[in-house]
């Protein structure tokens, strides 16, 4: 697994898989993905953090933002915390390159 700075985001890449941290703001007025907080991608969702609703919203937001299906985005650590570890599995190198370009553009 190699480390990728990716425009300031603390991200590890292994083949077609990314692992990175997100900092979640639940009950936000505006849902958004973008910006950094201590090396973690900031994700804001409208949903309240109860019964996994905010986690589902985080997965949906990230999947839409990265243009992958929700089934290929998973929270692997921090399910009850604002700081979560996310794994994204891409189908192809082209799909990963497209997401990487978007990430670098949004965070630069």
UniProtKB/Swiss-Prot annotation:
Highest taxon in the source lineage:
Bacteria
Give any Gene Ontology cellular component.
cytoplasm
List, alphabetically, the HAMAP family matched: UPF0235
Homology family: Belongs to the UPF0235 family.
Put simply, this protein is called UPF0235 protein RB8260
Specify the species: Rhodopirellula baltica (strain DSM 10527 / NCIMB 13988 / SH1)
């Amino acid at each position: 697994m190699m480390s990728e700075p990716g425009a300031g985001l603390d991200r590890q890449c292994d083949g077609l898989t990314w692992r990175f941290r997100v900092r979640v703001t639940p009950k936000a007025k505006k849902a958004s993905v973008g910006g950094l907080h201590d090396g973690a991608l900031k994700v804001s969702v409208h949903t309240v953090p109860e019964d996994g609703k905010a986690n589902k919203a985080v997965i949906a937001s990230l999947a839409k933002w990265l243009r992958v299906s929700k089934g290929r985005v998973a929270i692997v650590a921090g399910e009850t915390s604002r700081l979560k570890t996310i794994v994204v599995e891409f189908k192809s190198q082209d799909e990963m390159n497209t997401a990487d370009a978007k990430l670098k553009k949004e965070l630069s």
